[in-house]
Structure formats: structure tokens, C-alpha cells
Amino acid sequence: YRHIWLGEPVADSELSVIKPKWIDAAIDSHIKLGFEASGQRILGFDVADEGDDASATILRHGSVVIDMDEWRGQDVIYSADKVYLYGQDVKADKIIFDSIGVGAGVKAQFRRKTGKVQTIGFNAGGSVFKPEARYTDDKKNKDMFSNIKAQAWWMVRERFYKTWRAI
């Protein structure tokens, strides 16, 4: 029922990449582990068009998520402007945005901006980062991941898992 009607993922399946209990453990984990947020303030932005999908942002300060937002029903230009202004307001060091598909319009809109927030496109189908680097003793990154999206999601998974283990 919860999966079909409420949209909850089948969380404890062997096929789930990130377990909900790992996400729960990450909430305020920096406090539990005794460190403060530090480092760059990075705003991630996934844009959607005017359909049912949601646009979303996540603001992190170093490894600590400090804000999230989502909205629906707005065009790409509205969303790009909203995110850029928010990035300026929170003094983000950079905005990393989905730059393919609908995100191509974001790239064009960000180019028109004259503010100081750096904007970086993320091409999910792009090449693996540091393909020759060792992922494990017997595998290189290029042998483990098919593209940067798979690699990035696995990095997120590893952060959640390691945080859960630390807590």
C-alpha cells in the first residue's frame, strides 16, 4: 500500500541503493559526531519543466545539508532565476545544476547573470571522474561505473552508509 499509493520506495529491498535508516542516521549527524559545518557552500539544482516532475535544490555547507526546497509548475527561466537569487542570498560558492535535457535552458539563463556565484553544469551521462583511479584494489573507477551519474550516486550512497556506521 505505502509503496503503490503513497509513493514510498521499497526501501529495505536488496535492490535499494540507499537505505532509509542510513538517511535517518544522517540527520544532524554532524552534531552527534561533534563537528560543525565547514567548507564550501554548494547549491545543487535539478530543474524540471512545467509537468508533474518537481524542481529541487539542496544547499550544503561542506558535508552538512542545511536546506532543501522543491516546487512544481514553473518554467525553466523562472526556476533558474529563483535558484540564482537564492544562491546569492545564501552566499553560495557555486551552483551545480543538471545541464542536459531541460537543464540546457538553465545553462543559457545562468550565462546571462552578472553576479558572482559560479555555475557549473553537471552532465549525468558524462565520463567517469578519474577513470584510471582505483576504486578498490582490483577495480578502477572506469570498471565500476558507466558514467558520472552512477559514480556520483554511489558516492552519495557511500556517505550515507559510512555516516550510519559512524553513528
Describe the role of every protein-language-model region.
Residues 38, 49-56:
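Short, flexible loop/turn motifs enriched in small residues
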